[in-house]
């Protein structure tokens, strides 16, 4: 069972590694850029983005569960559907955290790295959404 769950966990972790490396490179090569000057606009944008992506994920998951292709039947038969559902579930959690980071940016809390954390989560969630769309396309198309 572990071999069937771990691919989903890896798919969730890999974008965070990519975003962390990009953050370190960004900080090294462009050290003067700061996103904390316009926290209210950033918070509103990220909260709106998170809410929209949650709606898209609900639609994608509904489409995936309702799809009746041979490829998806094999994935269910071999037990790998658990990994797919784990990726969707962790993406929902990630977008929920991003939504609340956006709300914290709208509040008067300052002194924390909330803008940096929120942009990192948003970047990783965008990569996750791209992976899920690619996965949805591959799982639901008919084989030629």
UniProtKB/Swiss-Prot annotation:
**Domain of life of the organism in this record?**
Viruses
What residue ranges lie in the Periplasmic compartment?
27-46, 105-115
> Which ranges does the record list as Cytoplasmic topological domains?
1-7, 66-85, 135-144
Question: What are the entry keywords?
Answer: Host membrane, Membrane, Transmembrane, Transmembrane helix
The principal localisation class reads host cell
- Give the membrane topology: Multi-pass membrane protein
**A single GO cellular-component term on record:** host cell membrane
Q: Membrane-spanning regions, if any?
A: 8-26, 47-65, 86-104, 116-134
| One Pfam family of this chain | RexB
InterPro entries listed in its UniProt record:
RexB
Q: List the subcellular locations.
A: Host membrane
Q: Could you confirm whether the keyword Transmembrane appears in this record?
A: yes
According to its UniProt entry, what is the function of this protein? May participate in viral genome replication by preventing the degradation of lambda-O protein (protein playing a role in DNA replication). May also prevent host cell death under conditions of nutrient starvation.
Q: What is this protein called?
A: Protein rexB
Record the organism: Escherichia phage lambda
Q: What is the lineage of its organism?
A: Viruses, Duplodnaviria, Heunggongvirae, Uroviricota, Caudoviricetes
């Amino acid at each position: 069972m572990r071999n069937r769950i771990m691919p989903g966990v890896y798919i969730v972790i890999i974008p965070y590694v990519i975003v962390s490396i990009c953050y370190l490179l960004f900080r090294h090569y462009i050290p003067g850029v700061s996103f904390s000057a316009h926290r209210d606009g950033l918070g509103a944008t990220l909260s709106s983005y998170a809410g929209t992506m949650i709606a898209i994920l609900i639609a994608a998951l509904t489409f995936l569960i309702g799809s009746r292709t041979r490829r998806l039947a094999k994935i269910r038969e071999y037990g790998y559907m658990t990994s797919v559902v784990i990726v969707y579930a962790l993406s929902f959690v990630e977008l929920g955290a991003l939504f609340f980071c956006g709300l914290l940016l709208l509040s008067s809390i300052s002194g924390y790295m909330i803008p940096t954390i929120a942009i990192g989560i948003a970047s990783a969630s965008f990569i996750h959404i791209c992976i899920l769309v690619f996965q949805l396309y591959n799982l639901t198309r008919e084989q030629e």
